[in-house]
Amino acid sequence: MKRVVVTGLGVVSCLGNNQEEVYQSLLNTKSGITFSEEYKEHNLRSHVHGKPNIKLEDYIDRKVIRFMGAGSAYNYIAMSEAVKDSGLEEKDVSNILTGMVMGSGGPSIENVILASDKTREKNPKKMGPFIVPRTMASTASATLAVPFKIKGTNYTISSACATSGHCIGNAMELIQLGKQKIIFSGGSDEVHFAMTAMFDAMTALSSKYNNCLLYTSDAADEKRC
């Protein structure tokens, strides 16, 4: 089988909006968990989240971002960084031997709610046509394949918290088997109170340390809760 190497990375997270910011946060043991007034107002048990601090419109053209929910927008910014980091030229990115396997736990819940609200108001025309790509199950790959002109393999994997790992593993296999030469792979999800509320209802979120973020969702810490 063919050898597989990683040539470019990109990231948008609560620890930073690019490789260097995230790296420095990790070196300095900085937590990206912050208090959410919105969660408290909606009476969730957990009042904390790890939401990226970024103004999406500063990074993405208006004509591109209108197709995206926040999760896809994070992915777009990360992929832009990965392309630059890899040194790939446009002819390498837009090529029949270059594909994409991207994932998300689900579509943009914010836009699903918007569509539901407009329908209940008996005014569905007000939601507009761009809400479709934001809420498709394949939104993670579809909203990146078009602006980056991906011509090869292109699909979305969704497998809960294992999504990005499965995408990267599948991308590796496609290269090993010689089906694609280059694959862009990863995943993202938006942070929205409605999605959080579902996990909050099953008591899967941290609620013990709402006023002490030091221990909240701290990996490998026996006091985390």
Q: Positions of the model-derived regions?
A:
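ACP-dependent fatty acid/polyketide chain-elongation machinery
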Residues: M1-V64, S86
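Residues that mark the start of a beta-strand
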Residues: R3, L97-G99
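Glycine-rich beta-strand-to-loop/alpha-helix junction loops that act as flexible
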Residues: L9, M102-S104
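Acyl-thioester C-C bond-transforming condensing/cleaving domain
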Residues: N17, N28-S36, I65, K84-I96, ...
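Generic hydrophobic secondary-structure packing signal
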Residues: E21, G71-A78, T163, C167
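A glycine- and small-residue-enriched flexible loop/hinge segment at structural boundaries
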Residues: E38-L88, M102, A137-K151
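Small disulfide-bonded, cysteine-rich extracellular recognition modules and tandem repeats
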Residues: K55, A219-A220
